[in-house]
Amino acid sequence: MIDIKEIREALPHRYPMLLVDRVLEVSEDEIVAIKNVSINEPFFNGHFPEYPVMPGVLIMEALAQTAGVLELSKEENKGKLVFYAGMDKVKFKKQVVPGDQLVMTAKFVKRRGTIAVVEAIAEVDGKLAASGTLTFAIGN
């Protein structure tokens, strides 16, 4: 398990853009993390005031940060940054609303130099909320 202190050491993101609360499981190429979605999230003020829904792009950002924790917690990548390079095959299947716990899984499927490709899913209560293939670059 990786707690919020270690997550903050790995990622440069801070409130309100830090979207990973805790890592539950981690291996060499796979990670499972959670985001507890609260009504106090700033994006709910405008998306949407009468029917708050977590924006899909922020779900994908949370998945990218999850993969980033895995990559940036490795000794050889300490102090580096992870940059989004693309998204493919993104699908949104279930709305994420206040009170939900987003369970995010990212698995590395390909690496070439400083470029990595990740298959990622986000679930709520065991149901698929979003999925996609994320590409990112590791840099200084």
UniProtKB/Swiss-Prot annotation:
Species per Swiss-Prot/TrEMBL record: Streptococcus agalactiae serotype V (strain ATCC BAA-611 / 2603 V/R)
Q: Which UniProt keywords apply?
A: Cytoplasm, Lipid A biosynthesis, Lipid biosynthesis, Lipid metabolism, Lyase
Q: What does this protein do?
A: Involved in unsaturated fatty acids biosynthesis. Catalyzes the dehydration of short chain beta-hydroxyacyl-ACPs and long chain saturated and unsaturated beta-hydroxyacyl-ACPs.
Question: Which Gene3D superfamilies does this UniProt record tie to the protein?
Answer: Hotdog Thioesterase
| Protein location | Cytoplasm
Q: What is this protein called?
A: 3-hydroxyacyl-[acyl-carrier-protein] dehydratase FabZ
E.C. code: 4.2.1.59
- Domain of life of the source: Bacteria
- Please name one Pfam family that this protein belongs to: FabA
| List of catalytic residues | 47
